[in-house]
Amino acid sequence: MAQTFTDTERAILRIVQKNLPDSATPYADIAEQTGTDEQTVLALLRRMKEEGSIRRFGASLKHQKAGYTHNAMVAWIVDKDTVDEVGRQAAEHRLISHVYYRPSTAPDWPYTLYTMIHGRHENEYLEVIDTLRKETALEEYAVLNSLKELKKTSMTYF
């Protein structure tokens, strides 16, 4: 069921979905900017976390600046009977940031599971591919190397 938000809650969410204020009291600053109090800000965020609308609250690392300069999307051929288990195994790897299942609709593209793997060097992400291949017995995959980042932003909802 879709949530409804008050104008104040939408204003709070507009701020927190971007960058928190660089301050010792970011939630008090948000409260001041939105005409409410710090407890209201914290209560909204706690409620949304408990409901599962907010998955986590934390810093976003720019992986290239942190030294993770090599990444690739790896597309795997996985049947739908094993996709949940294989997806769970892939998600356990610390260098895999995204795992998606998408049904194949193109006759010449049979891949259904997509993983985004990051490494400090090419061999690092190739090792993850090899490990996952051995753990899952998957043999058919395509490595789509990232050549250039054209856009990377977090989704803005409000």
Curated annotation (Swiss-Prot):
Q: In which pathway does it act?
A: Porphyrin-containing compound metabolism; protoheme biosynthesis
GO biological process terms, alphabetically, are:
heme biosynthetic process
Q: What class of enzyme is it?
A: lyase
Entry's Gene3D superfamilies? 3.30.70.3460
The protein's UniProt keywords, in alphabetical order, are:
Heme biosynthesis, Lyase
Can the keyword Lyase be found in this entry's annotation? Answer: yes
Q: Which GO terms describe its molecular function?
A: lyase activity
Instruction: Respond yes or no to whether keyword Lyase is given for this record.
Output: yes
User: Which Pfam family is one of those matched by this entry?
Assistant: NirdL-like_HTH
EC id: 4.1.1.111
Catalysed reactions, semicolon-separated: siroheme + 2 H(+) = 12,18-didecarboxysiroheme + 2 CO2
Role according to the record: Involved in siroheme-dependent heme b biosynthesis. Catalyzes the decarboxylation of siroheme into didecarboxysiroheme.
Q: How is the quaternary structure described?
A: Forms a heterodimer composed of AhbA and AhbB.
According to its UniProt record, which protein family does this protein belong to? Belongs to the Ahb/Nir family.
Q: What is this protein called?
A: Siroheme decarboxylase beta subunit
